[in-house]
């Protein structure tokens, strides 16, 4: 480095104008780099996150068709629409019937009966790492029929293979109509070509997953209808044996990439409060607790490194994703 006539440090062979031009070019390059970083942080990431928007729209539209079809089934069977079903979705059942298993919040049931839940399920599956062509296992109780169908619509829109095991028992305001249980809803939707995948197996749900506590006469009538429909029914009261049978059904065709749990069936949640403590939404396998004899499928799959989409605690789930909870009117 030498010095110019004014005592300033300079670069050999470079006059003042040349230095100014070089500085300007460097500043322009820095500005371009900064602009690119800002663009990627805002538009680029946003675009990457919403690259599945087409599947979200398809899932919402498909879920709307499901709701419409179920309303038609209820009309055929002379099942009145619930007064609590403010939006007339057909997804809200009576408070208590012979197949009601536990208490449930009507606000949560109404919140899930919104077509955009199909779009939310697409997002959750993508966040869990699921992609087209993957295989997903799903455990459905009758407590959240709308959310069950949202998962089915999301998987169908994403071209994901879904293996559902559905249960009859439902908490209050769920699929509690004894004449139209959730497994029957799904079966009819497949028969009518609205959905493409039926239950891989059906259980009665409730206590011991065998319908203990249900009205015996209604339980027998439902079993007869399910058998006549050709659905595979299994009744295994022993907890660990039940879990083994479910995993065998889920993984019969090969490994799964994700497990989806909807509602509070003991086979998914586990014995006691263990499943609730895990939270809701996408569960990372790194959050897994040690598996015990009381662990349900949620914990067991997490323990094997398989992500789980846990659809429970709807109020907290909607808050986390900026969605309304039990609004009087749904946003456009």
Language-model features, listed with the residues they occupy:
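N-terminal, Lys/Arg-enriched amphipathic/low-complexity engagement segments
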Residues: 57-114
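C-terminal functional extensions of proteins
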Residues: 265, 272-332
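N-terminal Lys/Arg-rich, disordered targeting/topogenic segments
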Residues: 2-19
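A substrate-binding/cap region within the structured catalytic cores of diverse enzymes
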Residues: 179-259
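Ser/Thr/Pro/Gly-rich low-complexity linker/stalk segments immediately outside membranes or between
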Residues: 44-58
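Short Gly/Thr/Asp-enriched flexible loops that form oxyanion-binding sites at enzyme active sites
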Residues: 147-154, 271-279
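Hydrophobic membrane-insertion alpha-helices, especially the h-region
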Residues: 25-42
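Membrane-embedded segments
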Residues: 116, 126-128, 134-181
């Amino acid at each position: 480095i030498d010095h110019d006539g004014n005592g300033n440090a300079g670069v050999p062979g470079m006059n003042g104008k040349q230095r100014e031009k070089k500085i300007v070019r460097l500043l322009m390059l820095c500005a371009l780099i900064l602009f690119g970083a800002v663009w990627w942080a805002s538009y680029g990431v946003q675009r990457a996150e919403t690259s599945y928007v087409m599947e979200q729209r398809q899932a919402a539209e498909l879920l709307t068709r499901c709701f419409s079809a179920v309303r038609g089934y209820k009309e055929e069977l002379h099942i009145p629409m619930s007064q609590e079903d403010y939006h007339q979705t057909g997804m809200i059942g009576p408070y208590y019937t012979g197949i009601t298993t536990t208490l449930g919040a009507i606000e949560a049931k109404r919140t899930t009966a919104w077509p955009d839940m199909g779009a939310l399920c697409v997002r959750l599956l993508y966040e869990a790492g699921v992609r087209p062509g993957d295989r997903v296992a799903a455990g459905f109780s009758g407590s959240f029929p709308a959310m069950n169908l949202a998962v089915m619509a999301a998987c169908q829109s994403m071209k994901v293979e879904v293996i559902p095991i559905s249960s009859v028992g439902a908490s209050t305001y769920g699929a509690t109509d004894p004449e139209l249980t959730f497994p029957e809803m799904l079966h009819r939707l497949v028969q009518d070509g609205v959905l493409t995948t039926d239950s891989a197996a059906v259980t009665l749900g409730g206590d011991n997953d065998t319908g203990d506590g249900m009205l015996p006469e209604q339980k027998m009538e439902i079993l007869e209808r399910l058998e006549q429909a050709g659905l595979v029914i299994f009744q295994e009261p022993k907890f660990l044996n039940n879990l083994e049978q479910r995993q065998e059904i889920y993984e019969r065709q090969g490994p799964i990439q994700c497990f989806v749990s909807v509602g509070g069936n003991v086979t998914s949640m586990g014995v006691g409060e263990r499943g609730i403590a895990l939270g809701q939404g996408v569960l990372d396998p790194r959050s897994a607790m040690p598996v015990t004899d009381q662990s349900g499928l949620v914990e067991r799959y997490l323990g094997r490194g398989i992500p789980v989409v846990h659809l429970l605690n709807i109020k907290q789930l909607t808050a986390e994703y900026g969605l309304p909870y039990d609004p009087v009117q749904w946003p456009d």
